[in-house]
Amino acid sequence: MKNNLPTQHTYTNIIFDLFDVLVLHSPLPSNILGKDKALEPTLMNFFKTEAYANYKKGVINLQQLTELLPKELPVSLFQTVLKQIPLNVQPIPEMIKLLELLKSRGYRLYLLTNVAPHTMPVLEQRFSFLQLFDGILTSFDARALKPDLKIFQLLLEQFGLKSTDCFFIDDLEKNILAAQQLGIDGTTYTSYEALYNELKSRFLL
């Protein structure tokens, strides 16, 4: 989606979402579930629960999360899957090149992501492109998940940003709408090509 703010505007900060914008999740390898393949729906549903959301917010730790598992879901299987998830994440090559281009143009780059505490350290070890960011704020550090306005407010405060100097890119429209409530302009990511054209039209490239 696009907002109705004037087309030509000077932005100095570009804020990126991580998942489904810069990186993608690959399916779990078939050998991970093995004989427990039938439990996959239960496992996937657990990742959508309030308990897992609280884990991503840093409200509960991994041990507390494990204690909330459905009885039919073995702890060992859950732990194996948790370790595998960050290894299944792969960057979108053209988006990483775009990051590098924006950095070379002098923009300050920020990352705002809903992510589990165990995942981010692995991604930081795997992906050097994360070093391009001038600041990173995770949901577990903010104790809030997008689209909660709290996480956007904290980003602005923590890095001393002025909302009208920022342009936000996220794959979920609800997150863009939340950011706009604080005066942060943005666009919903659908593809590299669409984003590139949008940035060109906004005079960001």
Residue ranges and their predicted role:
Residues Y52-V81:
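A metal-dependent, Asp-based hydrolase signature
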Residues K2-Y11, A116-P117, E124-L205:
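Asp-based, Mg2+/Mn2+-dependent phosphohydrolase catalytic module
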Residues I15-D17, Y110-N114:
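Short beta-strand segments
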Residues L33, L65-L69, V81-I85, A116-L123:
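Hydrophobic alpha-helical core bundles mediating ligand binding, dimerization, or RNAP-core interactions
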Residues Q63, L82-Y110, L149:
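Short, acidic loop-to-helix structural element flanking the phosphoryl-transfer center
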Residues K2-T49, A53, K57, Q181-L182:
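Active-site neighborhood of HAD-like aspartate-dependent phosphohydrolases
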Residues H25-P27, E94, V115:
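Acidic donor-diphosphate engagement hotspot in glycosyltransferases and nucleotidyltransferases
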